[in-house]
């Protein structure tokens, strides 16, 4: 079972995940570079029927790859649910290129922040049949803070400066607003401050850094 890297009482520890994990690709599944992500999404779009354009909102490693914070990822996560025709198109592209069956999935939809606003998203692909939006980085930050796996911590460090938070306290306030069902974490500001301090020396995550288990 995957373990979650969490911060409490001034230090990091490994605990059980706070939510169910998407089945992970095997080590033989090809990594998705930004160019591959765009190409495969266009192929998906071209397989969709005319007259009913669809939309996904990408988050996580795929969005960070598209924005230049990573060189690659294992899958494309959407916080907007995929319809049947979209899932069928995803499966066809997977068969065509030997990808994981759920290389594009909506498993993250259940963990969308309550602060998420689709109108604030960036447009990453504007195809007549498929619009691909990118979630605002501040929303991605709180989602990754919620997941808190090892690679999420690395991603948080990489994107901190680009998120535009005025302070660790502001980021913590957004986190608690995004997930109001969680108990108040008195150590969260210190955790975020540590991420921000490491963020000044952040670099793009290279291909060899991507762990297929994360």
What is each PLM-predicted segment?
Residues 2-214:
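Compositionally biased terminal segments of proteins
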């Amino acid at each position: 079972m995957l373990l979650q890297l969490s911060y409490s009482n001034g230090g990091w520890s490994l605990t059980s995940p706070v939510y169910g994990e998407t089945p992970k690709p095997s080590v033989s599944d090809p990594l998705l570079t930004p160019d591959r992500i765009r190409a495969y999404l266009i192929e998906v779009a071209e397989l969709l029927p005319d007259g009913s354009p669809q939309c996904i909102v990408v988050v996580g490693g795929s969005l960070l790859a598209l924005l230049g914070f990573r060189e690659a990822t294992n899958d494309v996560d959407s916080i907007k649910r995929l319809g049947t025709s979209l899932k069928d198109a995803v499966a066809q592209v997977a068969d065509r290129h030997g990808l994981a069956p759920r290389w594009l999935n909506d498993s993250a939809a259940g963990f969308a922040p309550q602060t998420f606003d689709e109108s604030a998203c960036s447009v990453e692909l504007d195809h007549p049949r498929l619009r691909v939006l990118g979630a605002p980085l501040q929303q991605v930050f709180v989602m990754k803070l919620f997941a808190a796996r090892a690679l999420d911590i690395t991603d948080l460090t990489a994107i901190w400066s680009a998120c535009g938070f005025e302070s660790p306290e502001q980021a913590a306030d957004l986190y608690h607003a995004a997930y109001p069902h969680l108990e108040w974490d008195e150590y969260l500001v210190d955790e975020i401050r540590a991420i921000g301090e490491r963020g000044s020396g952040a670099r793009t995550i290279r291909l060899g850094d991507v762990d297929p288990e994360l």
